[in-house]
Amino acid sequence: MPSMRIGIVCPYSFDAPGGVQAHVLDLAEKFISQGHHVEVLGPASESTQLPDFVTKGGASLPIPYNGSVARLSFGPSTFIRARDFINRGQFDVLHIHEPNSPSFSMAALKVARGPIVATYHASSNRSLALKFALPFLRGQLEKIRGGIAVSEMARRWQVQMLGGDPILIPNGVETAQFELNKKPLWSGRIPEIVFLGRLDEHRKGLDILLRALDQLDQEVRVTVIGGGNHPLAPRVDFVGRVSDEEKAEILGRADIYVAPNRGGESFGIVLVEAMAAGCVVVASDLEAFSAVCDAQSPEPSGILFRNGDADDLASTLRNVIENPKFGQELVTSGTQRAKEFDWDNVSKEIMRVYETVCDGTTVTAA
């Protein structure tokens, strides 16, 4: 496979952690390790520590987007920086993530000409900015030669709302990083439960987990990862934001990963990371989580509870803790499931899309 020059555009600020940002950086590093030249553009302050292959696009603003608050960058300077990034890069392919986002992604799509690939992460959008941008977007989206959706939900939303027919390629995980710290399930020790997410964001569902914990008679250790203000809670260790290495270490020593999210999820990358680390995954019955856990199969990779129902979550946790054999079956299935999302496999699928759209020309910006 000949070496490619690849430009990747991220709409969300690297100043704050997020699934799309992590996906972009991981994909870039994977392709660099395979001998390709990769550059990334996205919002980021000068003080934010990032790899040298990232062009920092400057400050961003918090904007309500997709049921959450995203830090985006827009305005004349965004278009100027996107144009400079493209013309300087001489890329064989430009990979734009979330081209619907009013940030560097939308700007890059507007100015770019040539082989363009887009990845859609979101499965719904209630952004007022997007509603205003839809007439403009539909014309611009015709420039995309290869579309990718990270989940069936994201693919379906894109088809219904904006047209096109992206192919399904999931998010990737470096499974080996999480397998390194894997420990046997609890046996003669107190089981550990882990939650990861922004603590003060209602849709992440931390309050549901805390209410469920109040109903547990079994002794458990609970570790909560994530930034934001947190309530006082007995037997809960709030560790704040952690590095990727620390996250892998915590998941590796843990026994159960709980994802009580209320909605706004199109995939669930941390579920895959937890599976790779050997955790039992307990998640709300969102469509995205059900798909990741392969919940309808004879050997599911995780167990679901009714969305928003702390009583059902408590009952589910009780069942897992009291039945280690059942927990081990979920771990075994989850470990195999996680391998399907390994970056080695995912990057090959993405590269096939690149090879399909490339025609020997260079991406330019008008």
Which residues does each predicted region cover?
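N-terminal strand-loop element at the rim of the active site
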Residues: 10-17, 24-25, 29-77, 81, ...
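Carbohydrate-associated surface elements
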Residues: 44, 153, 172
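Acidic anion/phosphate-binding donor-loop and adjacent secondary structure
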Residues: 156-159, 170-190
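Short hydrophobic beta-strand element within catalytic cores of glycosyltransferases
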Residues: 280-283
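Conserved acidic donor-binding segment of nucleotide-sugar-dependent glycosyltransferases
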Residues: 295-311, 319-325
